[in-house]
Design a protein with these regions (language model features):
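Short acidic low-complexity segments
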Residues: 37-48
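Short, glycine-rich nucleotide/cofactor-binding loops
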Residues: 51-61
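Conserved acidic residues
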Residues: 15, 48-49
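Conserved Class I S-adenosyl-L-methionine
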Residues: 92-111
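N-terminal, charge-rich interaction modules
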Residues: 1-32
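Beta-hairpin (beta-strand-turn-beta-strand) motif
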Residues: 56, 83-85, 115, 127
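Mid-chain, well-packed structural core segment of small domains
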Residues: 61-93
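Class I S-adenosyl-L-methionine
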Residues: 106-135
Length: 135
């Protein structure tokens, strides 16, 4: 039995959700979920528990990250989705590179999943959080 998209993303009972840039091809899977589509003043105030952001190139990703990263909680579940190489979407993002703004901001990639036949996602966590969890 395959895992649902929520199980893959380890989405549990987080309250302040951000899903930004959600493609229409998988939008239906999120239809029963209540989430913000961009960083709102309310999310800035409460901070983000769970974020899934979609980007097709590094410039777009870096713009999104400037808004999202300062508003994440210490232990937020934070995913960045990007097109697979086989998706036929022109992209400069891949799982091996393109993450300089995240790694420079103290984040590291800890997991990769496939959302569908077009999109993969990397989960990032703050480096010190990982040290606490595994230390």
């Amino acid at each position: 039995m395959s895992l649902s998209i929520f199980e893959k993303l380890q989405l549990a009972d987080e309250k302040n959700l951000l899903i930004q840039g959600l493609p229409s091809s998988i939008e239906k899977q999120f239809s029963k979920l209540s989430f913000a589509k961009n960083v709102t003043p309310l999310l800035k105030n409460r901070k983000i528990d769970f974020a899934l952001v979609f980007a097709v190139n590094e410039v777009q990703l870096n713009g999104i990250l400037r808004d999202v990263m300062p508003n994440l909680k210490e232990n937020s579940k934070f995913w960045v989705a990007y097109p697979k190489a086989t998706s036929k979407i022109v992209t400069d993002l891949n799982r091996e590179s393109s993450w300089n703004q995240l790694t420079g901001g103290g984040y590291e990639s800890i997991e990769r999943i496939e959302l569908d036949h077009v999109w993969s996602a990397l989960r990032f966590t703050r480096c010190e959080m990982e040290a606490v969890v595994n230390g």
